[in-house]
Amino acid sequence: VDGEKIETKTVIIATGASHRHLGLKSEDELEKKGVTYCATCDGALPMFRNQPLVVVGGGDSACEEATYLTRFASVVYLIHRRDSLRASKIMADRVLANPKIKPIWDSTVTDVLDVAQNKVTAVRLKNLKTGAESELPCAGLFIAIGHVPNTEVFRGQIDMDEDGYVK
């Protein structure tokens, strides 16, 4: 600290984690304009009320987000790259029994529309089994595909697993 060397037996690294992104340019351009990573933070906003919404993911977090959004949305599409949810059985059963949640299996979001309008109007989907592409109209995209640890600054200095989590 201020040029002084401090010796210690333990260092606590509490840098947290950031939301994992899809990696799309349009996702970044439309963040906070319909692209979000937190249903409880943003789901009740007027721009999402009584509108079709999309959640991406297949784990417990995605299922929780989709279930929460049914309070506000006209319909919630749950996009998952596999043919079944990775969520716990109780969460998966709850989602699959909810008439306002429509799963779309074996698919990924390849683009978010419409950057020109400066708001989310649809997502472009690709079916991973057939290769077919389609557009799904929506007012919001809620991304729930996990987190990335904020540990890059320590790479090469401490032991981490392949995902960047401290061992």
Where are the regions a protein language model picked out?
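A Rossmann-like FAD-binding core segment of flavoenzymes
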Residues: 6, 13, 70-167
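FAD-site-proximal beta/loop scaffold in flavoenzymes
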Residues: 23, 28-47, 145-167
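Glycine/serine-rich phosphate-binding loop and adjoining beta1-alpha1 elements at the start
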Residues: 6-33
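Generic hydrophobic/aromatic pocket-lining and core-packing "Φ" positions
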Residues: 66-67
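Glycine-rich Rossmann-fold phosphate-binding loop(s) that bind the pyrophosphate
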Residues: 57-59
